[in-house]
Regions:
Chain A
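The feature captures the beta-strand-to-loop junction immediately N-terminal to the Walker
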Residues: 52-54
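Helix-to-loop junction immediately C-terminal to a conserved catalytic motif
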Residues: 67
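Conserved ABC ATPase "signature" region
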Residues: 125-143
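Conserved ABC ATPase signature
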Residues: 147-151, 155
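Hydrophobic anchor residue at the start of the ABC signature
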Residues: 161
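Catalytic Walker B motif of ABC-type/P-loop ATPase nucleotide-binding domains
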Residues: 172-176
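Glycine/charge-rich catalytic "coupling/switch" loops of P-loop NTPases
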Residues: 255-301, 325-351
Length: 351, 233
């Protein structure tokens, strides 16, 4: 199991990014609201970040900026790019983006995947070896000779990922890789992304598919209107182990803490608990809730609208709960306060 | 009369008459050369117009579309005024020579190549361009790949331009002068021979021209029907 937050130097560091589309009539836009405004995002080597958000939340635009396809008006993007050689200095290398509906060239699958090596004038033997290896990774070895435009959606997506991987990028960007494709391809892609991350590649992908996001992500980055918004759930890594009884299961976190969850999810690796579903109290309360922990407040953050996000350390795991201003005052919550943390087994969703 | 001429014309075609051959070769030579010239200039311009944004792009596209309908005699007049002894390029002595016809026909073909290449390529998926950029292709490599992905549109543009110049008479007449064994083409020969009442050669040449024109149209139809997958236009 990978560490949740890598301590290594960031593979990607975004600061103060602002982007707005130029006005259509060519006139200088009058300080239009930026469609993407990301103040800070850091990603370590081997981490998977998943952008989630509605249509129009700026995920695709953000990915295109990171790929160097759109130029931001201001801000800094620093990327470690040891994997991607540039072509004759014509264009400095950038993270490689796989589009939501990838464009495959009207030629064979092999030629598609070999193209990035061909434009870099890689020697024939190495080109062949690296292309076949990328095809193998995506389970496409049998399709090398097929006419790419005739493939199914899932196969096309896998070819597009192989075509990006053949460059061995240190940062891979994927826009909705699992939309409109078959389950088999989704599983293949998830496995490949996990293996890539384990080999040190930083992955940023956007998705609508929350289950896929929770399964894969080291970091979930919720977005709305082009901005990062606070995450509203706790994501815990671990394993769902044997059932406590026929109704209640047990999820053992990587930190060793056991929490109760709905039964019948053995093998799940991720537990998700909404921050709204966590009750904080000064004394232990007797309720139907099966999970009763104790936690030490480590940070408090205002969310606006008289809501606060309280970060607690409960026997090694970090949980966040949302509380109102009134509760903050009644419980005198501040860093260092010891609180009882209660949530129902049914509030734990497993993926 | 027409029937007997037709019989003689077929005889002329079968016998491989040297004058008929010379005229046909001239025609094809001028048409192929001018189309190649127009393609060399027009295809890159069409691609650039399709993939890049630049100021006044819409105006340039409109002008190019409008020029597709350029009357051949106007092109003849324009190039004539440039190449005539008193014109700016008069010193080259090109007027009434094969290069003059080729230049004139290339001017005629250029807007067709540009407009049709632009039109075909701008219908390609916009993600093609972004894909090429993110995969690290250089500007030149991107241009090549876009032309390759839109190869059917490019080929159609070239064939259409060829069909236009091989059958035109204004430029060939005004700039070539219809000089026997030198600049006489199928169209100028038909115009002259018909005016003289010599139908045999006219009909034989008409048959050749129709075969060429039908061949081009057949090729175009074949290209339009041949759409291997989403990469084609």
């Amino acid at each position: 199991m990978r560490a949740l937050y890598s301590q290594a130097a960031p593979a990607l560091w975004v600061q103060g990014l602002r982007f707005s589309y130029p006005a259509l009539n060519g006139a200088r836009s009058q300080a239009a609201e930026p469609v993407v405004a990301i103040d800070d995002l850091q990603l370590g080597a081997g981490e998977i970040a998943v952008l989630i958000g509605e249509n129009g939340s700026g995920k695709t635009t953000f990915l295109k900026i990171l790929a160097g396809l759109l130029g931001p008006q201001s801000g800094q993007i620093e990327a470690a790019l040891n994997g991607v050689p540039s072509v004759g200095g014509v264009r400095s290398a950038a993270p490689v983006l796989v589009h939501q509906k990838p464009y495959l060239f009207a030629e064979s699958v092999f030629s598609n995947v070999a193209y990035p090596l061909r434009v870099r004038k890689v020697a024939r033997e190495e080109l062949r070896r690296r292309t076949l290896s990328a095809l193998n990774t995506l389970g496409l070895q049998g399709l090398a000779g097929r006419w790419a435009p005739s493939l199914s959606g899932g196969e096309k997506q896998r070819v597009a990922i192989a075509r990006a991987l053949v460059l061995r990028p240190s940062i891979l960007l994927l826009d909705e890789p699992s939309s409109n494709i078959d389950d088999g391809s989704v599983r293949t892609i998830e496995r490949v992304l996990r293996e890539l991350a384990e080999s040190g590649v930083a992955v940023i992908m956007s998705t609508h598919n929350l289950a896929s996001a929770y399964r894969l992500a080291d970091r979930i980055v919720p977005m709305a209107a082009g901005r990062r918004i606070p995450l509203e759930v706790n994501v815990l890594r671990g394993t769902a182990i044997e059932a406590h009884d026929e109704h209640i299961g047990v999820f053992q976190t990587v930190q060793g803490l056991q929490i109760y969850c709905p039964a019948g999810n053995e093998g799940a690796r991720t537990a998700v608990i909404r921050m709204d579903d966590i009750i904080l109290s000064g004394e232990e309360i007797t309720t139907s809730a099966q999970n009763r922990l104790q936690g030490n407040v480590t940070a408090v953050e205002g969310l606006g609208h008289d809501l606060f996000n309280v970060k607690l350390n409960c026997d090694g795991i970090v949980l966040r709960a949302t509380v109102t201003q009134t509760s903050m005052e009644e419980l005198a919550i501040r860093p260092g306060t010891m609180l009882h943390v209660t949530f129902k087994a049914s509030a734990v969703k497993l993926y | 009369m027409l029937l007997s001429s037709l019989g003689e014309a077929v005889g002329l075609l079968v016998s491989g008459d040297t004058e008929l051959l010379s005229i046909t070769i001239n025609s094809l030579n001028f048409a192929v050369s001018s189309t190649v010239l127009a393609a060399l200039i027009g295809i890159p311009l069409g691609i650039v117009m399709a993939v890049r944004d630049f100021p006044c792009k819409r105006t340039v596209v409109s002008i190019s579309h409008t020029l597709m309908g350029l009357p051949t005699v106007v092109v003849g007049l324009l190039v004539f005024s440039l190449l005539s002894r008193s014109g700016p390029f008069g010193g080259l002595g090109l007027l009434f020579s094969p290069p003059a016809v080729i230049i004139g026909q290339a001017v005629l073909a250029l807007p067709i190549v540009i407009s049709l290449v632009y039109g075909g390529l701008s219908r390609l998926d916009p993600e093609l361009y972004e894909t090429l950029v993110t995969l690290g292709a250089s500007r030149f490599q991107r241009t090549l790949k876009i032309a390759r992905e839109g190869r059917i549109a490019v080929a159609s543009a070239v064939l259409t331009a060829f069909g236009r110049v091989v059958g035109e008479v204004g430029v060939a007449m005004m700039l070539g002068g219809n000089i026997r064994w030198y600049t006489r083409t199928i169209t100028t020969a038909i115009a002259l021979e018909t005016a003289r009442g010599a139908f045999t050669l006219s009909i034989a040449l008409g048959i050749v021209l129709m075969v060429v024109a039908f061949g081009v149209n057949f090729g175009l139809n074949y290209l339009v029907k041949f759409r291997p997958g989403s990469g084609a236009v």
